[in-house]
């Protein structure tokens, strides 16, 4: 499908499910700066392949917000697509939140995949649409429903790095983390950032091109640590 056809398909889904505005950010479930192929939903719906940007689709308009690093690239890749470029930080250019607040109708509905939106950003969106008494539905990934050949989540194996490369054992790192937890009165520490999980566990992966990161989460208590990971990645 062309970009125009993808946007048309998304709008049909939006109408069927009652969305007035649908937002597609760049992020993955871990708020990574660079994401694996499965998470490149914004690139799929706009054709813009830069590492930063947010797409917003309405019944009549499609827009892409990105920063100054990508103005030239975005203008080239969006040409003829029907997607309007919003140059972030430029005079007179609304933020994503300002734009949504303006275009969403009274009692309308804003949608996005809540798994890839940080809490702070989500709260900003709640506040943006509140004056219009609009609702937010973050339970559906509409892009997944139209992306027929979407790459699967990476199943590439994890691998461990020895202390000669990491400089410190996982046990030592956990001991230091637990000391910090005590200082802050915490009994449970949840790690969602991929680089933090990899540093703590001394594990690496190949789930994001050019970055040795591993799709995973970790939960540390005073007694143990649990690693949440696709078990197909583990060989031992």
What spans do the regions from the language model cover?
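Terminal domain-start leader segments
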Residues: 1-236
């Amino acid at each position: 499908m062309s970009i125009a056809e993808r946007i048309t398909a998304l709008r049909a889904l939006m109408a069927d499910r009652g969305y007035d505005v649908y937002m597609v950010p760049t992020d993955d479930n871990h708020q990574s700066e660079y994401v694996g192929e499965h998470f490149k939903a914004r690139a799929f719906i706009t054709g813009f392949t830069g590492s930063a940007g947010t797409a917003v689709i309405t019944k009549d308009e499609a827009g892409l917000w990105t920063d100054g690093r990508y103005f030239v690239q975005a203008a080239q890749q969006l040409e003829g697509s029907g997607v309007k470029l919003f140059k972030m930080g430029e005079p007179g250019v609304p933020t994503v939140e300002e734009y949504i607040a303006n275009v969403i109708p009274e009692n309308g509905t804003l949608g996005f995949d809540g798994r890839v939106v940080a809490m702070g950003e989500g709260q900003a969106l709640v506040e943006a649409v509140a004056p219009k008494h609009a609702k937010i539905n973050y339970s559906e990934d509409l892009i997944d429903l139209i992306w027929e050949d979407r790459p699967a989540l990476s199943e590439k194996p994890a691998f461990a790095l020895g202390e000669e490369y990491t400089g410190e054992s996982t046990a030592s790192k956990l001991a230091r983390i637990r000391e910090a937890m005590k200082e802050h009165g915490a009994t449970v520490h949840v790690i969602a950032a991929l680089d933090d999980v990899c540093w703590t566990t001394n594990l690496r992966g190949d789930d994001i091109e050019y970055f040795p990161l591993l799709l995973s989460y970790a939960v540390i208590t005073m007694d143990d640590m649990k690693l949440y990971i696709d078990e197909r990645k583990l060989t031992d």
